[in-house]
Amino acid sequence: MSRYIITLKPIDKFFFGGDMTFSVGNNPNDNYNREYSSYLIESAYFPQQTSLLGMMRFLILRNNEECFDGVKITDTIKAAGLIGEGGFGEGRSYGKIKSLGHCFIKDCADNKDYHFAPYDSDYAVSAAEDTCLVNGRELTLHKMEGFSSKVWYKKYLECGSEKKEVSSFFVEDRRIGINRDIKTGKTEDAALFKQVSYRFSDSRYAFAFHAETDVDILPYDGQVVSVGADNSQFVIGIKNDHEDGNAGCSALKVTLLSPARLLSKDMDKVAFCMTEVMPFRYLRSTVHTKSYNVLDRELSRSERIEMYAPGSVFYFSSEADAEAFRNALNSYEDFRRIGFNEYK
């Protein structure tokens, strides 16, 4: 098994979809459009881990002539052995792809890696002497010097002691328009749309993540790949990676480096936290899928899951409680395998 550092340099603007899309098809009142569509769609800053998995699966597939002819899969058995039976899902294997790490930003000129900084990086957090009862449990109160509930906290990416606001890495690309019927030229119902995509603020930046595979992917370095449902295009860079990749952990504090799947029971040991949640869905497909139209039965959306956002911080009263929380994060193996639930 080989470990790689993979970079994605955007060719143009990029758009990473989230929970909502534009209206699909001609019926704005069908079930899909009622649940998922909006006239205002804004890209996420980072690609979803499932999008990186899909990109890697297709990269390996399209470079294998034994099971792919450039247009479609020709041998589903060989394809399943190469990239797995299907995309993300419980208990799934992804063939030659063994694991993916969380996505971060790399400064390719200075070889700096920027990861999400903890939400409390602007504040001095300490445990006060007072305690309180919450659901019958006695908890130590925490205080954050400098925090005001009237001023929303800033989000940063950090590289060592250096930190920059997340928004400083990106520049908005706004597109506003009206949809017209392609045959008649008449304005369609609910035709107004606004799409916010992004570009990097400096050409030196690229998305990056680590990957472990059982197939040599170095020959694919420099190819053009598509990421996300909007097919944003990137030039992929692939190099051997010999670093450990394991971030050190604080004894009584856990910071999320990636979105994380956690249930309410997993929060029982947390004494104090500063978090946000974000929606997560993914498309279900297999090597037998012929149509990738979201309205087709062959391609369906998963149920919505609430994930804890990267940068979320959790404090604990004892090392045992902190270790129990880390074990909970590690227990979601399907999510861990593709870069979710990573922490320091």
List the model feature ranges, each with a label.
Residues 1-344:
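Conserved active-site/ligand-binding neighborhood in enzyme cores
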